Structure formats: C-alpha cells, structure tokens
Amino acid sequence: MPQIILNARNLGSGNKTALLAVPWLGMLTSLLGNLSLLSYFAKKKEKEAMVVQTLGVVSTYVVIVQLALAEAMPLSYFLATSVVVVSGLVLNFLNYFGLLNAGIWRFWEDFITVGGLSVLPQIMWSTFVPYIPNSILPGATAFLIAVVAVTMSRSGKLSEKGVKFVGGISGWTATLLFMWMPVSQMWTNFLNPENMKGLSAFSMLLAMLGNGLMLPRALLIRDFMWFTGSAWATFFYGYGNIACLYFLNVISKEFFLAATVGLISWIGLAFWRDSVVHGHSSPLASLRDLVFGS
C-alpha cells in the first residue's frame, strides 16, 4: 500500500520518471508468481495462504496499472496481463468453493504450467537487455518443452514419476517467478540508484514482514517450496531493498537496524518454536527435516 500511495503521488504531480524505480518486469514476475501460487494453495485448500496470495495479486496488479498509466510498461503487455489476472482470480475461487468443472481446472493447471515455464526464462533474459541481445529464443524454447511435457503427461506417455514431476512444475515455476522479482529490483537499483527515492521503504518493510509471517507455517508443515519462496522474498526483496535504501542514505540507520534485529529475532524464534513442537533438541534439526524430510 505505501508503494501504491507513493506512486499515486508521483503520478498526480506529473513525476512519471519516479515510477521507473519500480521495474515492470519485476512486478510482472511477482504477479504471475503470486497467481500461480494462489492456484497451488487453492488446490491444497490452504485458506490463509490463499488470502495472502490474493492480496499479493491485487496489490501488485494495482502497481502494474500505475506503471501502465506512467507509460513505464508497454500497453500490450498490460492488457494481456489484465486478462490473465481476472481469469485466474475467478477460476481459483470457483475451484476453491467447488463450483468449477474438473476439466476446466485441469486446463487452467496446464495453462499456468506452460505459461509459467515459458515466461520465466524469457523474463530472466529480458531483465538484462540491452546488455545481452534482445531475443525470444529462451521463451520459445521453454514453451515447446512445456507443451511436449504437458501433452505427454495428459496422454499417459510418462511414467508415474514423470507425471508427478510435470505436476510439480507449476508450483516450482511459480516460486521461481516470485523469486525473480527481487533480482529484477536489485538490478534496477544497480542501474539507476538515483531513482531509489521512488521506492517506498515501508512497502519493503511490509514485504519483509508479510513473507516472514508465512515462514513458521511453511516450516511447520514441511513445505520446502513454500518456505523457499517466502524466505527468498523476505531476505532479498524486503530486507535486501531496505539495505539498498540504507546504503544510499534514503532511510535512517535506526530504521535499518530495527529491521535487521527484528528479522533475525523472528527467524530464530520460528525455528526454536518449531523444534519444540516437533520435539527436536536443536533448531537445526527442523531445517534438516525441511530440506531432506523427516
């Protein structure tokens, strides 16, 4: 919300350049990642996680609308994104309440698998243009691989392990999309440090807090994918950008130290409480169970 308010103020004053501090490619990866994770949690009936992901989709989409108004995002990409977002929200909630045909849901799962696997390498490549040649080859190659994999899975031409692997692609792709946003933001910070004042410190704090609050639940149920995405966003998007703002003298030393102490304390508390719940003698045992299984 603070980033949305800051963007609205800059738009209202005609300062469209300030919105370039927020990379549209980074916002797009976050949006698609949140939408795909929403499908993942809707299927698992994780109500609280669904609410968090829905808020993430809606708030990120509002930022994308602002970037489109500032002409910081191509109109064609914005329109395509809008169609996918509206469709995704409707389908996910219809499925959660048992109002969606199973065939339509399977089509949506295949769509986000193919779409996510195609978009991820393309966005990763495009982030570094013009330092590397502009090309659609990464996305096109991934698209063909994804279509073949999904087709073989649905037609029964894969082993049970192969079907399970393809079924898990969308979840991990969503996590990687979500994880790429901090990379895109850090790259933008590196290229245009003078635009950092257009980045809201309170938005980064909320990103750190929001993702950090998901860590205990992901740790408790031993969901490594969920934990990985939340931890990455907590450290690299939320705290990482707070660190950038501090080193560029945009925020105070007290703000930075409070965020640092708070984050370390919360992570320590989460692992300590988890070790108590599971009867472990050390928090490291909880980490071992998370990564390698109990």
Q: What residue ranges belong to the model's regions?
A:
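Alpha-helical membrane-protein topology signature
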Residues: 1-294
